[in-house]
């Protein structure tokens, strides 16, 4: 509806920043994933994001809007309360212990993932709002830079920052469903195009 509403306006070609996700990629994929890798979503969420990317590119190509899509890494540490998203433990195992609360870890320590901080996410959007879109080109959906870290590395960083007592608040409760799901997620990216355009994690 939004894109069609924009199309219906005369002499109106706004910049549209679309929040996409690394969930547009599913197994099998190389590690790291290059910018040229095709979308292979394996979830409804990832499929919806991929559809959004295609629509954004098409409406941009037709001159209806000036689009740029940002494939965000998983944002960590997210503020607020834990939620039911399968990825929520990445923030929870840091945020909750730092607040003196117990956190559940449903996966193995060797799970790796692609992260960016809330501050970096804000920077991504500010940069996207002002970047010269001629430099972005026709492929207007970008995989953004981030930090590839394992759960073990997260816990080690927590211990360095807050001590062993804080780490002891992490309760290991293996969940085979979540672990299988998380192992199907991408772990690292080259993100060369976004870096060359000035996006920084």
Question: Which sequence ranges carry the predicted segments?
Answer:
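Mid/C-terminal beta-alpha module of Rossmann-like enzyme folds, strongest
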Residues: 97, 124-179
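Short-chain dehydrogenase/reductase
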Residues: 31, 37, 42-50, 83-91, ...
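Conserved C-terminal active-site "lid" loop/helix of NAD(P)H-dependent oxidoreductases
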Residues: 118, 174-199
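Active-site Tyr-X1-5-Lys
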Residues: 27-29, 42-68, 73, 98
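A conserved pocket-lining segment of Rossmann-fold NAD(P)-dependent short-chain dehydrogenase/reductase
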Residues: 72-83, 92-116
């Amino acid at each position: 509806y939004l894109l069609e509403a924009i199309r219906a306006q005369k002499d109106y070609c706004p910049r549209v920043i679309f929040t996409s996700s690394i969930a547009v990629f599913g197994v099998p994929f190389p590690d790291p994933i290059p910018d040229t890798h095709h979308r292979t979503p394996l979830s409804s969420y990832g499929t919806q994001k991929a559809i959004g990317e295609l629509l954004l590119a098409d409406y941009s190509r037709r001159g209806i809007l000036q689009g740029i899509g940002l494939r965000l890494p998983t944002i960590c540490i997210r503020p607020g309360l834990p939620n039911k998203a399968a990825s929520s433990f990445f923030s929870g195992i840091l945020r909750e212990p730092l607040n003196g609360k117990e956190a559940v870890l449903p996966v193995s320590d060797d799970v790796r993932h692609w992260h960016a901080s809330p501050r970096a996410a804000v920077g991504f959007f500010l940069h996207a709002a002002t970047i010269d879109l001629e430099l972005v080109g026709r492929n207007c959906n970008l995989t953004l830079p981030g930090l590839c870290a394992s759960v073990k590395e997260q816990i080690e960083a927590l211990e360095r920052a807050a001590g062993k007592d804080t780490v002891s608040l992490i309760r290991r409760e293996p969940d085979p469903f979540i672990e299988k799901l998380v192992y199907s997620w991408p772990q690292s990216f080259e993100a060369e195009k976004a870096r060359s355009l000035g996006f920084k994690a």
